[in-house]
Amino acid sequence: MVREMFVGIDVAKAQLEVALRPGGVRFTVENSAADIAALVERLSGHEPSLIVLEATGGLEQPLSIALAEQGLPVVVVNARQVRDFAKALGKLAKTDRLDAQLLAEFAERIRPQVRDLSDARARALEALVTRRRQVVEIMVTERNRLHATYDAAVRGDIEAHLLYLQGRKDSLEQELMVLVQANPDWLSKAQLLRSVPGVGPVLTVTLLAELPELGCLSHKQVAALVGVAPLNRDSGLLRGQRGTWGGRATVRTTLYMAALVARRSNPVIAAFYERLLAQGKAKKVALVACMRKLLVILNAMLRSHTPWQHPLVPTPAT
């Protein structure tokens, strides 16, 4: 029987810490193009079942792309996912640093879904989605500064910057649309997604770029992947209600905004939301449930290649 091997790699600016599991082999290499190429070749010889890297603000991209282009199964995970996993095992204090051995254990026990990182077009789409999000975050910060500033010169400077940022945001959104329209598969999926009331262009491109598995997984799997599936967090003396945690935070945030719109404009989501409130659910709990329901609907539509059909929904009881 062939024994599976799992690899964790802790990426820093100067070096890469690598851990193999089982076996406990650990070694460190420089974070350079030459050493990355040598590491990829070395790992290829082990035929690992899964390689896990922590997202480190882009530092991980050269390595993750090189591994993917070699055909190796690599996953870039959010640090919070691994930290929650480690705390559940009692292996990590709040301020402890994640290491390669922990990432390897996470790979072996959790086995996160592998994403195709080798497609240059997909990387370009994700990069543009990320950049648009960054511009929006800067705009929010600048608007907050504007509200707190009374000096005329400073206000004028902030307003000019906001005008520039709005132009950049518009340009990025146009570039995203061009990319989607140039790819028949993305365009087909986008048309299906946009047929759903409450699903706009931002959620559409976010799902295409950051949740390419949509339509290929079960409802439970896709909900867990995004982080809207209710999960038990009981451990030792820690007992409580089920909650949602982990998953792809950027997708979840965008889905939250879409659910806010859908609870007013989508008859299915609106009726579902009112029914949960009538059952005594808190508004936040009901909204998270709406996020999950909307995601499940979108997953089913892409899997069956079926556009949205407006159902006859009875008016919720008041």
Give residue ranges: language-model regions:
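Charged substrate- and nucleic-acid-binding regions of tRNA-handling and nucleotidyl-transfer enzymes
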Residues: 278-309
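Short alpha-helical scaffolding segments that buttress acidic/His motifs in well-ordered protein cores
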Residues: 106, 125-126, 207, 254-259, ...
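Residue-level recognition of specific faces of alpha-helices
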Residues: 8, 124-127, 161, 189-195, ...
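A residue-level signal for conserved active-site and pocket-lining positions in enzyme catalytic cores
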Residues: 103, 135, 255, 280, ...
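Phosphate-backbone recognition surface of nucleic-acid-processing proteins
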Residues: 201, 206-279, 283, 310, ...
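Phosphate- and other anionic-substrate recognition elements at nucleic-acid/protein interfaces
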Residues: 1-167, 263-264, 285
